[in-house]
Amino acid sequence: MNMLTALLINITLSLCLITIAFWLPQLNMYTEKASPYECGFDPMSSARLPFSMKFFLVAITFLLFDLEIALLLPLPWAMQINNIKVMMLTSFILVSVLALGLAYEWMQKGLEWTE
């Protein structure tokens, strides 16, 4: 019974805090809350603004190459393993696939900003 009492107290306290956190910011709307935050976007307007596909492609390319660096960074420590041929083949395949993806995006003019 003691465990049930503690559970009920925790649930009640959590619900009270969630309710207070939800209603408290809506009580005092002053100009600082309504002004644009560091990014310059109006916080009271719709968040569904049109997004440039060029920026999206550059962001995806950045993420892919960032992932490549994260995967290739442990290679110096992997050199100490016994089966170095498999490790080198895997890293070569990874770099080749990413280079082919970059070449494809370049050929499709996904990196051109003049269009």
Swiss-Prot record:
Tell me what topology the record assigns in the membrane: Multi-pass membrane protein
Which InterPro entries does the record associate with it?
Answer: NADH_UbQ/plastoQ_OxRdtase_su3, NDAH_ubi_oxred_su3_sf
| Membrane-spanning intervals of the chain | 4-24, 55-75, 86-106
The record's principal subcellular location, in a coarse class, is: mitochondrion
Q: Name the GO terms of the biological process aspect.
A: mitochondrial electron transport, NADH to ubiquinone
Compartments in which it is found: Mitochondrion inner membrane
An example Gene Ontology CC term for this record: mitochondrial inner membrane
Example of a GO MF term: NADH dehydrogenase (ubiquinone) activity
Family according to the record: Belongs to the complex I subunit 3 family.
Q: How does this polypeptide assemble, per the annotation? A: Core subunit of respiratory chain NADH dehydrogenase (Complex I) which is composed of 45 different subunits. Interacts with TMEM186. Interacts with TMEM242.
For this protein, the record's PANTHER family field holds:
NADH-UBIQUINONE OXIDOREDUCTASE CHAIN 3
- Its protein name is NADH-ubiquinone oxidoreductase chain 3
- Species this chain originates from: Isthmomys pirrensis (Mount Pirri Isthmus rat)
